[in-house]
């Protein structure tokens, strides 16, 4: 269960993987995009996981209809704004919303820098209107190669004062981290944090690479760390965060069952692991479900769930004073 007197964070939440089905329908109609179905009920199976997918790439294909309807920058702004409202409705106090501007721009050849500006505008408006805290993480989608990632990074860095970190996501097997060393040097030189999707489709070596070569202080998913005792020790000793996404890992067939998910063992090992959603609209879940259903099914005790919630605050890309303010606000709820 969620401890209401502590801040609730979601640090691994894809803005472009959380586009409402109703919004997809409306934008599809507006921009003349031929969708596979034209009602909420019939479109849902195309944009939401119905049963576990055989691979990460198959899972990611469910996101494609959401970005296919982003016909102009106002559509990107709308989706960003709605993401903040969705976080509020999920009882989240602080969200880090990540997005790939190249992926969002691709279908309708939007200017990548314009997409970043629109998302920044939408999230800032949402924070103003809905009263929760949110920050942005820019994603380089390695699926599209190193040149596209440089274009993406240039766009992200053009708004670096409104972005807290840069991530590397996408095809972990086909585009290993060693191709992006120079990209992340630019990220660190710009003073931004680094989080990397690793140890999801590829093995522990991908996580070592993210930490040593790319400068990651947090790892997205990281489930394969369980196969490397030295890595487990390193993560605990150096306080490298693991952004765990229980239902997502089940739906991508990264784990066979929640009962075999390594999150419980990460926490027992003293690793700073926290609970997150990933792509809530695609998964058909929200953060309370992860705490109240998925985490107990993964074998976590109530104390471990509470620890994971605390870890989320510790790992947040926030200043100490911002974290203290969130703690004080949550404490008033009792």
Curated annotation (Swiss-Prot):
The active site is at residue 200. GO terms for molecular function: 2'-deoxyadenosine deaminase activity; adenosine deaminase activity; zinc ion binding. The record marks 221 as: Important for catalytic activity. InterPro entries: A_deaminase, A_deaminase_dom, Ado/ade_deaminase, Metal_Hydrolase. Its EC number is 3.5.4.4. Zn(2+) binds at residues 12, 14, 197, 278. It catalyses: adenosine + H2O + H(+) = inosine + NH4(+); 2'-deoxyadenosine + H2O + H(+) = 2'-deoxyinosine + NH4(+). It is an enzyme of class 3 (hydrolase). GO terms for biological process: adenosine catabolic process; hypoxanthine salvage; inosine biosynthetic process; nucleotide metabolic process; purine ribonucleoside monophosphate biosynthetic process. Pentostatin binds at residues 14-16, 141, 170, 200, 221, 278. PANTHER family: ADENOSINE DEAMINASE. Belongs to the metallo-dependent hydrolases superfamily. Adenosine and AMP deaminases family. Adenosine deaminase subfamily. This is Adenosine deaminase. It comes from Vibrio cholerae serotype O1 (strain ATCC 39315 / El Tor Inaba N16961).
């Amino acid at each position: 269960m969620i401890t209401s007197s502590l801040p609730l964070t979601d640090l691994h939440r894809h803005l472009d993987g959380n586009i409402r089905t109703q919004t997809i329908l409306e934008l599809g109609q507006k921009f003349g995009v031929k969708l596979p179905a034209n009602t909420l009920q019939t479109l849902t199976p195309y944009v939401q996981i119905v049963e576990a997918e055989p691979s990460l790439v198959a899972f990611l294909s469910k996101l494609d209809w959401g970005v296919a309807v982003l016909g102009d920058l106002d559509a990107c702004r709308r989706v960003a704004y709605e993401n903040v409202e969705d976080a509020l409705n999920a009882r989240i106090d602080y969200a880090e919303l990540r997005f790939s501007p190249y992926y969002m721009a691709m279908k309708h050849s939007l200017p990548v820098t314009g997409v970043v500006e629109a998302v920044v505008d939408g999230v800032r408006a949402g924070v103003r209107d809905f009263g929760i805290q949110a920050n942005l993480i820019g994603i380089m989608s390695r699926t599209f190669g190193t040149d596209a990632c440089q274009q993406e990074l240039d766009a992200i860095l053009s708004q670096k004062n409104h972005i807290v970190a840069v991530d590397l996501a996408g095809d972990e097997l086909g585009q290993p981290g060693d191709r992006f060393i120079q990209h992340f040097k630019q990220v660190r030189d710009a003073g931004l944090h680094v989080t990397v999707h690793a140890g999801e489709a590829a093995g522990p070596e991908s996580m070592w690479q993210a930490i040593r070569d790319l400068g990651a202080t947090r790892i997205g998913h990281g489930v394969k760390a369980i196969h490397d005792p030295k890595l487990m020790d390193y993560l605990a000793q150096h306080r490298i965060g693991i952004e765990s996404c229980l239902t997502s890992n089940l739906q991508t067939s990264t784990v066979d069952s929640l009962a075999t998910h390594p999150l419980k063992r990460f926490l027992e090992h003293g690793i700073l692991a926290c609970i997150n959603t990933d792509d809530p609209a695609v998964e058909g879940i929200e953060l309370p479900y992860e705490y109240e259903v998925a985490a107990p099914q993964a074998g976590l005790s109530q104390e471990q769930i509470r620890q994971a919630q605390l870890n989320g605050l510790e790992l947040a890309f926030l200043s100490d004073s911002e974290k203290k303010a969130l703690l004080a606000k949550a404490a008033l709820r009792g």
